[in-house]
Amino acid sequence: MHNVSLTIFANFKIDNEERYLRMKDSFISFKDIPAERWVINIRGSYKSDTFDFLKKHLGEKLYHYDLQSSNGWFHDTRVMLKDINSEYIFFWIEDHINMADVTIYDNILKDMCENKVEHFIYSWWHKSVLNKYEYINKKETNNINIYNLSDSNIRIIEKRIGTYFMPISAVSISTNMFFRKIVTSNHPKLKRWPRETPFDFEKRSSDFEFFPFVLSFPKFELFANIDDNHGTVGYSLIDRGLYENRMTRDEIKSIEFRKSFNYYRLIKPIFPNVIWKLLVSISDYIRRLVYTYG
């Protein structure tokens, strides 16, 4: 079989020293992955330091962008697509650390190619994510579990867990075509997140236009998040004692999002539950209008 081509893609904001240090640690953990190009857009006050660091290590493999248009993350990502022509695209999220020998990724990519996998989630490897898929049939290789995310299989999972789930993730390796389908769509029409963020890349099981597709997960842990437990106590590398706790997650968020107090907690007890749910729904709708048209 031919060698499967891979591009590392990132469009991230490095805006404080802790974020910069974590980016460096993340990079070092998988820098020898067999990728032809690293197509990277860098935003934030540490963008020069980040560029210098990546250029030093990557040389001519680095395809650097300095984009931060008012049109937002998806617009700027579409500009970058002209330098991405590989079969697969690795979406690098800078606060996840590789835990595996990078030589395994050759075998994973070959398994993906042979089994026509379109989307592979390389992190968040814990039971609250993986157990959702135990209700549908899977195909296996030595390295990955493979699932057909058909409409019927999605409905089976939703019925068993009682809600929607998130089968399309940023921490992923996708086929070029599938990645482009996501970033060139105008979905959702009412944005769930601010336009300068990448979070609308991730899709719910109710986002029908992206299904069916072939999804896979590793059979062993590859990457893990530095400080986010992702709803599973003890999951993060900091909680496992595997990463230095220089700054807490709340401290980083207070710097990056300028949030120091949650007013919802203060006013929620004032309202009956039914009224509170209605107010939250109205607030959420207004927020999405602002994200879309503001």
Where are these regions (language model features)?
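Short, well-formed alpha-helical segments that are part of the catalytic scaffolds
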Residues: 15-31
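Short beta-strand-to-loop acidic/aromatic patch adjacent to the donor-nucleotide binding site
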Residues: 87-97
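C-terminal catalytic/acceptor-binding lobe
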Residues: 19, 171-177, 181-294
